[in-house]
Amino acid sequence: MPQTSVVFSSILGPSCSGQVQPGMGERGGGAGGGSGDLIFQDGHLISGSLEALMEHLVPTVDYYPDRTYIFTFLLSSRVFMPPHDLLARVGQICVEQKQQLEAGPEKAKLKSFSAKIVQLLKEWTEAFPYDFQDEKAMAELKAITHRVTQCDEENGTVKKAIAQMTQSLLLSLAARSQLQELREKLRPPAVDKGPILKTKPPAAQKDILGVCCDPLVLAQQLTHIELDRVSSIYPEDLMQIVSHMDSLDNHRCRGDLTKTYSLEAYDNWFNCLSMLVATEVCRVVKKKHRTRMLEFFIDVARECFNIGNFNSMMAIISGMNLSPVARLKKTWSKVKTAKFDVLEHHMDPSSNFCNYRTALQGATQRSQMANSSREKIVIPVFNLFVKDIYFLHKIHTNHLPNGHINFKKFWEISRQIHEFMTWTQVECPFEKDKKIQSYLLTAPIYSEEALFVASFESEGPENHMEKDSWKTLRTTLLNRA
């Protein structure tokens, strides 16, 4: 019988290559009698009915599913059913197999069967602990573990493994809950309304150059923040992009849809960094100092690129391309823009960001062959990554004409998500500077209105449209005051 796909072999290593390992065996009875509902192509599973795919997940006496399949199916199944329903079906299949073993000649293999079920549950709870945060899932988990414990009442090996698994699960759930509570307490940077009339900033007011004047150091601290923020994103958060869009397409609201707080927080960080860059430039009074500020951020963006921190690089470029900054022609005329032009070339949106994708591929290859943590860093442009997942979902159907689930599609989505998760687990090798990070995370940022006011005060409006905008803004802010 053909085996599960090899898509993750380069990521998970030889022990998880997608091929049956010694002692793993094949799915007994042709995938539990459901092999006719599983379609393989060149040895790769490409489609199947939901029932057959669920049966393919559950071990037998002589079969254990490949880890790549476990991860992919557990991740993608939530598009079709909530985790507690899948867990309930897994429990039913376990009961059926247990009864067959008890009634047949292989009763002695019950202990081996129960150990494999516990191993499957262990992998599930480790990969997706949040699946067990609701009472329904916990009840199903307890029901399954109670049944398999009965298969090894003599020496209690299975019972001990279940106890360890449960303890680890509870610790993971507690840690995630505490992290989310902490994130929700942290306020975003204060929004500064900016000057209402032209005034010089207070002498004591700091800018980024007063905190850090080394582009490399600032790029390293930005990388620290990126890795810290992205580490709170989990595979199921990313798969919600798919399931949420299905809900919208079908005009229904998923009541069990978990808040994608981590995704929103990470997206907000990108926007805050862009606005901080624009604020730092626009609030500088002297043109010479604004020029220096722009050149500094260009150097920071270049260092981010060299590190592999494409998300911060894109945020910085986006900040410098905001209208209040981009319109400062007199300032830009003094800037040595050759390095900025190179950065914009890397982020050129033409041909679906072809240049960026080439650079990302190079960083990925460097990461795979890396000998140090520094070489392993890959932080993609998150908005583009999300769009890739979204479009991959939109251009390929969930179901084929014969009613099968298009599992080939979910292999690819899962592969991309797994690769992203690998990048998020890299330990940042740079020394942490609390002073710099505090400034980056808490420095007041101008609102869009305030940015335009500061920009116009630095370089007056040059055409009728700008003059009208400037007049309207001044009137609005004065009335508001």
Curated annotation (Swiss-Prot):
Tissue and organ distribution: Detected in brain and spinal cord. Highly expressed in a number of intrahepatic cholangiocarcinoma tissue biopsies.
BP GO terms, sorted: cell migration; positive regulation of Ras protein signal transduction; Ras protein signal transduction
Domain of life (superkingdom): Eukaryota
GO MF, one annotated term: guanyl-nucleotide exchange factor activity
Annotated SMART domains: RasGEF, RasGEFN
Span of domain N-terminal Ras-GEF: 41-170
UniProt-listed InterPro entries: Ras-like_GEF, Ras-like_Gua-exchang_fac_N, Ras_GEF_dom_sf, RASGEF_cat_dom, RASGEF_cat_dom_sf
GO cellular component: cytosol; plasma membrane
Keyword line: Guanine-nucleotide releasing factor
Function: Guanine nucleotide exchange factor (GEF) with specificity for RAP2A, KRAS, HRAS, and NRAS (in vitro). Plays a role in cell migration.
The protein's name in its UniProt record: Ras-GEF domain-containing family member 1A
Organism: Homo sapiens (Human)
Gene, per the UniProt record: RASGEF1A
